[in-house]
Every structure is written in C-alpha cells, then in structure tokens.
C-alpha cells in the first residue's frame, strides 16, 4: 500500500512539472537550473569533452585539478611560486643568500629534543 502511494506521488509531481514546462512555451528557459550546470547538455556536441565544455567551465576544471595535485604535496616549490625564474642560479648556494662564498646553510640552533641532535 505504501509503495502505490509513493508511485502516485511521483506521477503527480511529474505531471505538475510537465504541465508547468509546457505552459511556459520554451523548454530551455524554464529549466535554467539544469542548463547552468551543464551547458553542453542540449547542444548535441559530438567532439571531445574539452571541445564541448565552455571555456570558463574548462578553466575551472583545470584549476580544480591543479589544486588537488598541489594539495597532495607537503610543499610548494619556488618554481611554482615564480614561473620562469630561478631563485639562485649558483650551484650549491642558498636560496636566501645567493652571494659568492656565502654559506649554504647559515642557520645554527642549539641541541634539544625537538631538533633530535646527538649528544
């Protein structure tokens, strides 16, 4: 008995939606919430996914993938922060002190449990 009531409810809702769509006259305009999420749904595009997706949606997809890849790493390299530039081109030099003859690691810290140095 409960199943038949559920079926009747679904049929009634579908009938209301269909009558609302037909009364507006234009199928595409009445379902803006569907078209906003998938611009190529009704276009009949037969190309690749990249060709069928609008440019702005494609760029959002690309940045989403980039964020996921960066989220998997524990660090961001200097190359990712500044494209086409090298922080220090001298071999073995520190990124922070890129002068000739400078120490590669000028920092010194005391021995403690946190630094795990051997005593």
Curated annotation (Swiss-Prot):
Disulfide bridge map: 88-98, 111-117
Pfam families in alphabetical order: RALF
Signal peptide: 1-23
Keyword entries, A-Z: Disulfide bond, Hormone, Secreted, Signal
Post-translational modification remark: Proteolytically cleaved, probably by S1P, a subtilisin-like serine protease (subtilase).
Keyword Magnesium: no
Compartments reported by the entry: Secreted
GO cellular component, one term: apoplast
Gene Ontology MF term list: hormone activity
Site feature: Required for proteolytic cleavage: 67-68
Keyword Ion transport: no
Matches recorded under InterPro entries: RALF
Single biological process term from Gene Ontology: regulation of growth
Highest taxon, organism lineage: Eukaryota
Proregion positions: 24-70
Family from the record: Belongs to the plant rapid alkalinization factor (RALF) family.
Function of the protein: Cell signaling peptide that may regulate plant stress, growth, and development. Mediates a rapid alkalinization of extracellular space by mediating a transient increase in the cytoplasmic Ca(2+) concentration leading to a calcium-dependent signaling events through a cell surface receptor and a concomitant activation of some intracellular mitogen-activated protein kinases.
Record protein name field: Protein RALF-like 22
Lineage: Eukaryota, Viridiplantae, Streptophyta, Embryophyta, Tracheophyta
């Amino acid at each position: 008995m409960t199943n038949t009531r559920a079926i009747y409810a679904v049929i009634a809702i579908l009938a209301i939606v269909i009558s609302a769509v037909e009364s507006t006259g234009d199928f595409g305009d009445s379902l803006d919430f569907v078209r906003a999420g998938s611009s190529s749904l009704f276009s009949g595009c037969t190309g690749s996914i990249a060709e069928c997706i609008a440019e702005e949606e494609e760029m959002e997809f690309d940045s989403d993938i980039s964020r996921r890849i960066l989220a998997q790493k524990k660090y961001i390299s200097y190359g990712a922060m500044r494209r086409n530039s090298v922080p220090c081109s001298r071999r073995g030099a520190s990124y922070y002190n890129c002068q000739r003859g400078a120490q590669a690691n000028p920092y010194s810290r005391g021995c403690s449990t946190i630094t795990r140095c051997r005593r």
